[in-house]
């Protein structure tokens, strides 16, 4: 009878996944600091990236070094933001946000993923119109819905969405109101479990069978690329077993 993966094997896989996540967060911190300065109190994007790092148990020293490299206090690599759009099998729209120090490498990697999984890359704007850019502050079950809703609306949020299946709550904002709402809720003692600005599809597309398998394969392959920060799609996640 065969044996499952060893404890050491599982640990190595976990360490690799954690290392990849740290790399992505450090790149986001670097770009945010270079664009808006190294003071998170005056740079909402940097603060969001730092919060993400701290939530992932990244040390403050690692975060500080990333900031200093970006602001010129330490030598570091300069990354640029690039975005690619395309279609997965079944007409599923996909947006891929990247931070890279080599555009040629990145576009080749992204194009390879689309091609290998039966999709195709599109031109700029080819699918972005199917999505809205918005801030999402996510709260776990257990928080008082009325208190959160009142505070969020007063702070300038656009909507509050409650998920009855698990009791989680999302506070939705316009991108330019994201930092204001987050700070107001924090001041009221309401700290989200997760907060970021994302693309959210206007409508989801259902897929099944082999198409669902290929879509999942493409999304996983894109997310696993070192230069890719975020992958958004309009696939119905339930169809992928998510």
Swiss-Prot record:
It is found in: Cytoplasm. One of its GO terms (molecular function) is DNA binding. InterPro entries: Integrase-like_N, TACO1_YebC-like_2nd/3rd_dom, TACO1_YebC_N, Transcrip_reg_TACO1-like, Transcrip_reg_TACO1-like_dom3, YebC-like. Gene3D superfamilies: 1.10.10.200, 3.30.70.980. GO terms for biological process: regulation of DNA-templated transcription. GO terms for cellular component: cytosol. It holds the Pfam family Transcrip_reg. Keywords: Cytoplasm, DNA-binding, Transcription, Transcription regulation. Belongs to the TACO1 family. HAMAP family: Transcrip_reg_TACO1. PANTHER family: TRANSCRIPTIONAL REGULATORY PROTEIN YEBC-RELATED (PTHR12532:SF6), TRANSLATIONAL ACTIVATOR OF CYTOCHROME C OXIDASE 1 (PTHR12532). This is Probable transcriptional regulatory protein XOO1659.
